[in-house]
Amino acid sequence: MLSPTLELACDLIRRPSVTPVDAGCQELMMARLANVGFALEQMRIENVDNFWASHGGNDGPVLCFAGHTDVVPTGPLQAWNIPPFDAFIDDQGMLHGRGAADMKGSLAAMLVAAERFVVDYPDHRGSVAFLITSDEEGPAHHGTKAVVERLVARQQRLDWCIVGEPSSTTLVGDIVKNGRRGSLGATLTLRGVQGHVAYPHLAKNPIHLLAPALAELVSEHWDSGNAFFPPTSFQVSNLNSGTGATNVIPGELVAVFNFRFSTESTVESLKSRVAEILDKHSLDWHIDWALSGLPFLTEPGALLDAVASSIKAVTGRDTQASTSGGTSDGRFIATMGTQVVELGPVNATIHQVNECILASDLDVLTEIYYETLIKLLA
C-alpha cells in the first residue's frame, strides 16, 4: 500500500504536463488544499496556469511552499525503460517517471505535509501558503515572476519560502540551496567585411578579429567569489559565422555567451568590462543582453536554521548549504525580501531519460517539510 505522498506523486506524474500545459495537476492540488481550509486564488496569465493558496490569519509570518507542475519534454519515448508518465515503482523501490524528481515528488510531499500540519495545528500562527506555476521549465515570463508582481502590488507579506527543487545529491536532505548565482546572457554580433579568401587585404575576417578578444574574455578574472558563491564564470555556448562556401571570408560573426555571477559582480560591472575588452581590440560590435536573474542569498537565520534542524531530526544528517547549480524560481521570490531555501529529492536523473528517485525519499521529505512547519509556525 502506498503512502499518501506516494499516491499523490504518482497521480501527478501520470498527468503529462509538459511546459506550459498543467494537465489538471493544479486542479488536483487545489481540491486537496480546499478540503483542509485553504483559501485559493487561480491566476491564469496568458497560457500559463498559476495559483496562490493560503491558510491562517493576516497576522504573523508567512511560510510559502513554491513549485512547478510543468515538466521538460520526455525525449525519445523508445529510450525509456518504462513509459515516462506511468509512475511505476520497481522492485528496488525506485519511482520512475518524468517529474518524479523535478518536481512532482516535492509537490506531493509539500501538500501532504501542509494538510497534516493544518489539521494537527488548526490555530497555528501566521500563514501557510502555496505558490504554484506551470511555467518554470520554459520561458518563465507568466509564471512565478508574474505572480510575484501581483503579490507585491497588493503588499502581500512573504517571510519564508521553501522551493521544492531537487537539491539533494546522494541522500535526501544532504544539500539545500540557500541562494543561486545570477545569470546574464549575451548575443554578440561582430561586423567585418566579406570578401574572397584569396584577397584577405580586401576583407575583414570577423573570426580572426574576435579571436584575441575572445581569448581575453575567456581568461579574464571577473571576481574571486566569496564565502557563499564561487567566482563568476564566463562560458561561450555558440559561435556562428561563414556563408557555407569555402572560398568566402564571412562578413559577420555571432557569439552567444553567458555569465553565472556572484554577488561580488553586478550586471553593469560585467557589461562594462566586456565593452572595455572589445573596444580595446577596435572591434565593430553590438550586444543584446538578457538578464535571467540576479544572484540571491539566504544567510543563516530562522528559515535555514529550521530546515537544517528538521533534516537533522528526521534523517540524522547534517545538511550543507550551497549556491551551486542553475537558476530557479527562487530568484523571483527573493525580490520580495523573502528568505528562500530550496529543498527537494536527489537530482541525479533530472531532465534525463528514465528519470527516477527512491520512492521512500518522498516520505522522508514529507517529514522534513512537516517538521519545518512545526518549528516555524506551530
Swiss-Prot record:
Reactions catalysed according to its record: N-succinyl-(2S,6S)-2,6-diaminopimelate + H2O = (2S,6S)-2,6-diaminopimelate + succinate
Pathway: Amino-acid biosynthesis; L-lysine biosynthesis via DAP pathway; LL-2,6-diaminopimelate from (S)-tetrahydrodipicolinate (succinylase route): step 3/3
Keyword Oxidoreductase attached: no
Gene Ontology terms describing biological process: diaminopimelate biosynthetic process; L-arginine biosynthetic process; lysine biosynthetic process via diaminopimelate
Keyword field: Amino-acid biosynthesis, Cobalt, Diaminopimelate biosynthesis, Hydrolase, Lysine biosynthesis, Metal-binding, Plasmid, Zinc
Pfam families: M20_dimer, Peptidase_M20
Ranges in coiled-coil conformation: none
Molecular function in Gene Ontology: acetylornithine deacetylase activity; cobalt ion binding; succinyl-diaminopimelate desuccinylase activity; zinc ion binding
EC number: 3.5.1.18
Enzyme class: hydrolase
Disulfide bonds listed in the record: none
Function: Catalyzes the hydrolysis of N-succinyl-L,L-diaminopimelic acid (SDAP), forming succinate and LL-2,6-diaminopimelate (DAP), an intermediate involved in the bacterial biosynthesis of lysine and meso-diaminopimelic acid, an essential component of bacterial cell walls.
Protein name: Succinyl-diaminopimelate desuccinylase
Active site feature: D70, E136 (proton acceptor)
Organism: Pseudomonas syringae pv. syringae
Residues bound to Zn(2+) 2: D102, E137, H351
Record's subunit section: Homodimer.
Needed cofactors: Zn(2+); Co(2+)
InterPro entries, sorted: ArgE/DapE_CS (IPR001261), Bact_exopeptidase_dim_dom (IPR036264), DapE_proteobac (IPR005941), Peptidase_M20 (IPR002933), Peptidase_M20_dimer (IPR011650), Peptidase_M20A (IPR050072)
Record-stated family: Belongs to the peptidase M20A family. DapE subfamily.
Amino-acid positions noted as binding Zn(2+) 1 in the UniProt annotation, renumbered to this chain: H68, D102, E165
Cofactor binding note of this UniProt entry: Binds 2 Zn(2+) or Co(2+) ions per subunit.
